[in-house]
Amino acid sequence: MEEIKRKPLFNPKGDIDVRNRRMINFNTTNINDFNNMRYEWVSDWYRQAMNNFWVPEEINLNQDKSDYPKLSEAERRAYDKILSFLVYLDSLQSANLPNISQYVTANEVNLCLSIQTFQECIHSQSYSYMLDTICNPTERNDILYQWKTDEHLLRRNEFIGNLYNEFVERQSKDSFLRVCIANFILEGIYFYSGFMFFYNLGRNGKMPGSVQEIRYINRDENTHLWLFRNMLLELKKEEPELFDEAHIAEITEMVKKGVEQEIAWGQYVIGDSIPGLNGKMVEDYIRYLGNLRYRSLGLPNLYEGYEKEPESMKWVSQYADANMVKTDFFEARSTAYAKSTAIEDDL
């Protein structure tokens, strides 16, 4: 098990030559020098993430307060359980990202991880705002803690949670790779049954404020996915032994498990009882996402026949675009919130 070194905090003897900088095990000074970055992609990522700033309470949820009691039993059950799951995921992220950052020795990447951590806190704020608006305090607490009272949801969370705990308890190059892959799976696969549910509500004219909150969260998660994909690709160049045949097999199994868990979760929480969605649509879309994420790491497709976005699900990406020039009917403000062009990437 190869060692990974925790970066020092005060290090006057650190290496200031940017050409020597590495993702892990570099002798860093921790100085944030925006004019000298080892990884050129960081500048674009940083600017995009900064320009994506938003405030949850600026989105009007009055219509949602009226709509929520009118949802069908299946829709309300799915809304509650998906929101509980999202609360858990983003809370876990804001707690875990600093653990990863302690071992990342490229200071410009640490800047990105700090922004991501902040954005995960904004997402938690958003979910709290949604819950405070639509339900009473007792209902709120019940929804908030379904991530551990619902046995299916608890099992769902154990895979990523255990991988995160492993890195906290035993730091090595291998466990660092696994925790980064776990982040990649969480950001790129785990959210999407939930996202598609909210967007389906949106295209049926329900819960417009919740849909808009999710669109901004989705946009942030896309940048987080892009960040971890690039971190992994840099690791692949700098630590090629982490991407040998045995490690690729492990990565493959992790992604497959993430895909299968997301499909099972989507079919449990959405099923065939919600107008506009069914279990087959969930499975088709998540397998497509699994291929898309896996290919972005320079690997082949995992699932034959799922290479392209399913025709039945093309509306998901349309609803996910928070930068469409459009005025929200409930608040008369442009959803082109970002001040710069969104990062174009095949993720």
Predicted regions and their residues:
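Non-heme di-metal
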Residues: E2-L347
